[in-house]
């Protein structure tokens, strides 16, 4: 008799996706981050659901409701810090996942890559709106500054900003709608993840060598299920350590002060995972130019498949491209550092240099070096 997992309509889908799926035998730990992102999403949805049961999205009570969760709700502090630091783990895994895609040329699977870019934007939007909800100083001023950027759009900008605010400033209407969208988006993200996996399973997974692995495949279960479980344990250990020993390490102390529209914090900055984009935004002295650079810093990922000039998919056999890749990583770390610094000399010029270098590496140097490597290999 055929196994039920191969005949049952629902189990059949799970079976072909996670059990009998043929996977390349050479996948390294860099291929763990997709499943880690799935766990992050599950943790965020679960902790977020329980937090939403006690949170009130009203300017008068939002800050106090978060305090109430931490002080009075059973294990509320665990939920709150798991959710806040879970977002950081989410972005660490997300950036490593994208970095893996860049290094090993996974962007050649264009549908999977493009859905991934949409997912990245959706997760960033969700995280931004979530940061506004505790209604601390940095929540309020972060929301004011970032939403105000839309006013740089010619002609419709001001109307658009007021439409998003639901008034003439960030206020109760803004907080309520941000809560509604923050609750809704993770479920849309979950649906998009299904689409992401659907497209991935159409082509099959890439592998570290960049060489087609059709002759050498192994079943996903038990090999990669156990490998993924090990990844889960390591990540959840790191998250638990962060939550239980140093929950405020990645947060901003200003957010423990209730929002006050009459008092601007000395340095308005987003959470650490947006600092690289924030540094690019600040490095251009023109509002519209800054906004375009900010959007392009992420949207440039969609252009990468178009500027792939190498005859090889992966960078594993291309040492010059590897040097450029790690230069890009160092550049992004520099931008992250600059984004958290005040706008003064020498940080301004460092930020501007790093921003130019970011676009230069991706749009000009990478394609040039790839073409040069083709000639060196006489291809």
Curated annotation (Swiss-Prot):
Q: Which residues bind heme b b562?
A: 83, 182
Q: How is the cofactor bound?
A: Binds 2 heme b groups non-covalently.
Against PROSITE patterns, the record matches this protein to: CYTB_CTER (PS51003), CYTB_NTER (PS51002)
Q: What family does this belong to?
A: Belongs to the cytochrome b family.
Lineage, opening ranks: Eukaryota, Metazoa, Chordata, Craniata, Vertebrata
Which InterPro entries does the UniProt record give? Answer: Cyt_b/b6_C, Cyt_b/b6_C_sf, Cyt_b/b6_N, Cytb/b6-like_sf, Cytochrome_b, Cytochrome_b_C_euk/bac, Cytochrome_b_N_euk/bac, Di-haem_cyt_TM
Its membrane topology? Multi-pass membrane protein
Q: Note the subunit structure.
A: The cytochrome bc1 complex contains 11 subunits: 3 respiratory subunits (MT-CYB, CYC1 and UQCRFS1), 2 core proteins (UQCRC1 and UQCRC2) and 6 low-molecular weight proteins (UQCRH/QCR6, UQCRB/QCR7, UQCRQ/QCR8, UQCR10/QCR9, UQCR11/QCR10 and a cleavage product of UQCRFS1). This cytochrome bc1 complex then forms a dimer.
What does this chain do?
Answer: Component of the ubiquinol-cytochrome c reductase complex (complex III or cytochrome b-c1 complex) that is part of the mitochondrial respiratory chain. The b-c1 complex mediates electron transfer from ubiquinol to cytochrome c. Contributes to the generation of a proton gradient across the mitochondrial membrane that is then used for ATP synthesis.
Q: Name one GO molecular function term.
A: ubiquinol-cytochrome-c reductase activity
Q: Which residues bind a ubiquinone?
A: 201
Keyword Nucleus on entry: no
Gene giving rise to this polypeptide:
MT-CYB
One Pfam match: Cytochrom_B_C
Compartments where found: Mitochondrion inner membrane
Where does this protein hold heme b b566? 97, 196
UniProt GO cellular component terms: mitochondrial inner membrane; respiratory chain complex III
Where are the membrane-spanning stretches? 33-53, 77-98, 113-133, 178-198, 226-246, 288-308, 320-340, 347-367
Entry protein name? Cytochrome b
Cofactor(s) the record lists: heme b
GO biological process: one example: mitochondrial electron transport, ubiquinol to cytochrome c
Alphabetical keyword list: Electron transport, Heme, Iron, Membrane, Metal-binding, Mitochondrion, Mitochondrion inner membrane, Respiratory chain, Transmembrane, Transmembrane helix, Transport, Ubiquinone
Cite any additional comment in the entry.
Heme 1 (or BL or b562) is low-potential and absorbs at about 562 nm, and heme 2 (or BH or b566) is high-potential and absorbs at about 566 nm.
């Amino acid at each position: 008799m055929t196994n039920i997992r191969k005949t049952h309509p629902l189990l059949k889908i799970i079976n072909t996706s996670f059990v009998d799926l043929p996977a390349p035998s050479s996948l390294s730990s860099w291929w763990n981050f997709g499943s880690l992102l799935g766990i992050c999403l599950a943790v965020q949805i679960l902790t977020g659901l329980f937090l939403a049961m006690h949170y009130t999205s009203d300017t008068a009570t939002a800050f106090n409701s978060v305090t109430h969760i931490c002080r009075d709700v059973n294990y509320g502090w665990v939920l709150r810090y798991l959710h806040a630091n879970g977002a950081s783990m989410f972005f660490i895994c997300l950036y490593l996942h994208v970095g893996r895609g860049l290094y090993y040329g996974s962007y050649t699977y264009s549908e999977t890559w493009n859905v991934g870019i949409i997912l990245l934007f959706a997760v960033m939007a969700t995280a931004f709106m979530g940061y506004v909800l505790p209604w601390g100083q940095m929540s309020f001023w972060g929301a004011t500054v970032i939403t105000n950027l839309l006013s740089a759009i010619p002609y419709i900008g001001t109307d658009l900003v007021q439409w998003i605010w639901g008034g003439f400033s960030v206020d109760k209407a803004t907080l309520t709608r941000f809560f509604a969208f923050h609750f809704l988006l993770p479920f849309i993200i979950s649906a998009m993840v299904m689409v992401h996996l659907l497209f991935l399973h159409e082509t099959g997974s890439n592998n570290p060598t960049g060489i087609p692995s059709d002759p050498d495949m192994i079943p996903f279960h038990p090999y990669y299920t156990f490998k993924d479980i090990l990844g889960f344990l390591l990540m959840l250990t790191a998250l638990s350590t962060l939550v239980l020993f140093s929950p405020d390490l990645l947060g901003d102390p200003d957010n423990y002060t209730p929002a006050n529209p009459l008092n601007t914090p000395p340095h308005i900055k987003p959470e650490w995972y947006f600092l690289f984009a924030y540094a690019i935004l600040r490095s251009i002295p023109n509002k519209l130019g800054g906004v375009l650079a900010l959007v392009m810093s992420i949207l440039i990922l969609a252009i990468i498949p178009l500027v792939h000039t190498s005859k090889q998919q992966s960078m594993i056999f291309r040492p010059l491209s590897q040097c450029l890749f790690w230069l890009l990583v160092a550049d992004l770390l520099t931008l992250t550092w600059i984004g958290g610094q005040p706008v003064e000399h020498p940080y301004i010029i460092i930020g501007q240099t790093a921003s130019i270098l970011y676009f230069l590496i991706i749009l000009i140097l990478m394609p040039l070096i790839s073409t040069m490597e083709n000639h060196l290999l006489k291809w």
